[in-house]
Amino acid sequence: MKKLIFVLLLALGAGAAQGQVKFETKSTDAVREMAIKSGKLVFIDLYASWCPPCRMMEREVFSRKDVGDFMQQRFVAAKYNTDKPTGKELMKRYGSGAIPLYLIFDTQGELLGRIQGASAPKEFMESVQKIIDGSKRR
């Protein structure tokens, strides 16, 4: 009986994890190559482990199945800690000092838009969609 409960809990946990946003931790060049191959845009999450709004987004937004599905269809997503070299460089280049900061790029590396700060899932997806829609008009 204990084995059955363990297997069921494991299966439920695996199902829940499938809906989450899958973030790459590879180099920015590798992420861009993945986006080119898949025909998707690049989404970058600049965060810090000590940042409460960053942790809230991870817990309440990026863990949701609807957000995960939305992001998976449109992006190769990556996340970089702003306390580490890649995150510091991206923050220096594209940020204004406040995190979380979300950057959306096309496959040529052109910045299409940025979202700064935490938001509720619906507002987050609307902000992302607005950037995507704006990029289609270019």
Where are these regions (language model features)?
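Sec-dependent N-terminal signal peptides
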Residues: L4-G13
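Sec/Tat signal peptide C-region and signal peptidase I cleavage site
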Residues: G15-G19
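Loop/turn elements at helix/coil->beta-strand transitions in domains of secreted/extracellular proteins
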Residues: S38-V42, Q73-V76, T107-L111
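Thiol-based oxidoreductase modules, predominantly thioredoxin-like and allied folds used
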Residues: K22-K26, F62-T86
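A short beta-strand-turn-helix
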Residues: F23-L41, M71
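Conserved redox-active cysteine motifs that mediate thiol-disulfide chemistry
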Residues: L46-F62
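Non-catalytic, surface beta->alpha helical segment in thiol-disulfide oxidoreductase systems
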Residues: G97-R138
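Short pre-active-site segment immediately N-terminal to redox-active cysteine/selenocysteine motifs
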Residues: G39-V42, L46-W50, A98
